[in-house]
Amino acid sequence: MTQSVHAETHGFQTEVKQLLSLMAHSLYSNKEVFLRELISNASDAADKLRFKALSDASLFENDGQLRVRLVVDKENRTLTISDNGIGMTRDQVIEHLGTIAKSGTAEFFKNLSGDQGRDSQLIGQFGVGFYSAFIVADKVTVVSRAAGTAPEQGVQWESEGEGSFTVADVTKEGRGTDVILHLRAEEEEFLDDWRLRAVVAKYSDHISVPVEMFKEGTPDREEDGETVVGTPGEWEQVNRATALWTRNPKEIKDEEYQEFYKHVAHDFEDPLLWGHNRVEGAQEYTSLLYVPARAPFDLYNREQKHGLKLYVQRVFIMDDAEQFMPTYLRFVKGVLDSNDLPLNVSREILQDNKVTVSLRKACSKRVLTMLAKLAKDDAEKYAKFWSEFGNVLKEGPAEDYANREEIAKLLRFASTAGEGEAQTVSLEDYVGRMKEGQQKIYYITADSFAAAKNSPHLEIFRKKGVEVLLMWERVDEWLMSHLTEFDGKQLVSVTRGELDLGDLEDEASKQAQEEAEKANAGLVERVKTSLGEAVKEVRVTHRLTDSPSCIVTDNHGMSTQMIKLMRAAGQPVPEQKYILELNPDHALVKKLDTIEDEALFGEWVTLLHEQAQLAEQGGLNDPASFVSRINRLLLQA
């Protein structure tokens, strides 16, 4: 290898400098992962070359035996991870090794807390890849040449992991990439042959590309008066190099599944659960699907790529094949290996492919089955899953109508039957506890747990001992607009329309309600006249027992939470008028009926309306007027 004069110095992207500094402190306790990351990158480079060579065999350059080699130089204290994969051009080296081309980067750094344990998990999720080399090296040299380019088009990248790196043109005979680690004095353990073999066996046994180390030969020697011929030195494969998903699941240990997950997902934590499935028949495919233990920091970033590693007949095709997993399952990682897709498949071909549609359905069903089994067998573990991914799963009924019932069974909610805000109640739990005569599943959506739990709309349900599901996440209103029934029972918002308790109300209660409506007809009309266009309707309530008033959305109107959701998304929202319901048994409403002064009557009516708005919406358009009105009425009391 010879170096040319075309050398340049570049500054690292700010985020790279931050990441390098963080790794030195947060990942040092698990420093051997650098080798896993670098071998994983080398394996990916081999996979990409194998795929590109399907359409251009000349890229192999008469060397189709893809491999990764570890080369130790004890004298110079260097460890080299060398591959003969796809390689990189000068521009690619600058792009990939000098910047983090990843959406959500700023959000990632914002989430770092300074807590070493938590930060190491976040960094692991982010995928440090190449930069992990600086955990053990004080200088890193990368020499690369892209497959299909001339030897003179090689490039050398070098950095000490500080603020800058240099790039120079070099001549490199073989294609691929050499990552040369100049190890720190205290890291000489990674120059030991057996230490390296142990790390490879631990982390890289499952990758499909052979990892090789040089085995020294032995000289001729005399033994029992005879000459024993020595053996020449040779490259020896030190990993199994069999794609994990192609093996019999019964022969694979949990530790192997866990390490393969870390290779696929570039995560430092073990997965929460996984499923390995081989299907033969009309379609032939193998899937190995993982659910992570922790949500990635960019889970809600729609620009971030998600999806499975796609292989066709064990040949790598692409990363992040999102066509095989719906967006509500975008947290799922893993591998899909199909025998039915063409080797020259592209993302465009996948979009409208019948095989793709069938595989997507099968993979979705598989994940939902895995989650259902987890929920049944290990409630504590499922609760952990729900806390990490529950809000994403709630997107499911809107996206996946065919699996709506299965998704609904996986949903968890807080309810009035519990004390805290832990979301542990399933719809099946709720149905199993329904009171005799109850025909509907009742729920409420609000801005917070406290707002939901203390809503005046719940008063009649508490009085009758009827459980209500409590929802306060932003996605809940969207969920409930697409999940209208479960197990043949309608899901009903307690803040919408006329309250129909069905058989939960006896004839005496219904008659009392009718009499209250007749007795207060004059007051209702007077209140409606006073409020005018501010409300859609005024009526006597039978959902309140302690509060004087509440506002209700009519059956066809847009709920408060849906309005907030649309406004947050920048969508235009039509003007919404609510129904005001009055509790005729409350002292304030009774007082209204005795006020003859129309101006004073109007003040009290407006106050009751504003109180109801505040309880339902969490705010008012004109809070200053509300405060002034309270002060005036207090002075008159």
UniProtKB/Swiss-Prot annotation:
MF terms (GO), sorted A to Z: ATP binding; ATP hydrolysis activity; ATP-dependent protein folding chaperone; unfolded protein binding
Put simply, this protein is called Chaperone protein HtpG
Return the annotated region ranges for C: 565-637
Tell me yes or no: is ATP-binding among this UniProt entry's keywords: yes
Enumerate the InterPro entries for this protein.
HATPase_C_sf (IPR036890), Heat_shock_protein_90_CS (IPR019805), HSP90_C (IPR037196), Hsp90_fam (IPR001404), Hsp90_N (IPR020575), Ribosomal_Su5_D2-typ_SF (IPR020568)
CDD domains this protein is in? HATPase_Hsp90-like (cd16927)
Q: Which UniProt keywords apply?
A: ATP-binding, Chaperone, Cytoplasm, Nucleotide-binding, Stress response
Q: What is the lineage of its organism?
A: Bacteria, Pseudomonadati, Pseudomonadota, Gammaproteobacteria, Aeromonadales
Q: Which region ranges are annotated with the description A?
A: 1-347
Q: What does this protein do?
A: Molecular chaperone. Has ATPase activity.
Where is this chain's protein located in or outside the cell? Cytoplasm
Checking Pfam families in the record gives: HATPase_c_3, HSP90
Listed under subunit, the entry gives: Homodimer.
What family, per the record?
Belongs to the heat shock protein 90 family.
